[in-house]
From Swiss-Prot:
InterPro entries: Snake_toxin-like_sf. Belongs to the three-finger toxin family. Short-chain subfamily. Expressed by the venom gland. This is Three-finger toxin MALT0070C. It is found in: Secreted. Disulfide bonds join C24-C43, C36-C60, C64-C71, C72-C77. It comes from Micrurus altirostris. Keywords: Disulfide bond, Secreted, Signal, Toxin. One of its GO terms (cellular component) is extracellular region. GO terms for molecular function: toxin activity. Residues 1-21 form the signal peptide.
Amino acid sequence: MKTLLLTLVVVTIVCLDLGYTLKCYVGRKPYKLITCPEGSKKCATVPLPTRPLPIFSKGCYTSCPSQYVKCCSTDLCNGSPTSG
């Protein structure tokens, strides 16, 4: 009986996690890791118009922004917290 109950719990957890959720780094340094909202299909790193040194912002997007340094569609693909 315990085995059946454990099996049902595991199957329920697996089924609840079937909805794909993209994870991206977001914001400016220090970057934060978040689970993107539903509908977000891309992670991107975009340049902000700053001088003299460029500043980059990372985030979740429904499609690639018009200006981007990196745009991708897998978990955490827009770089680590220590990268530009």
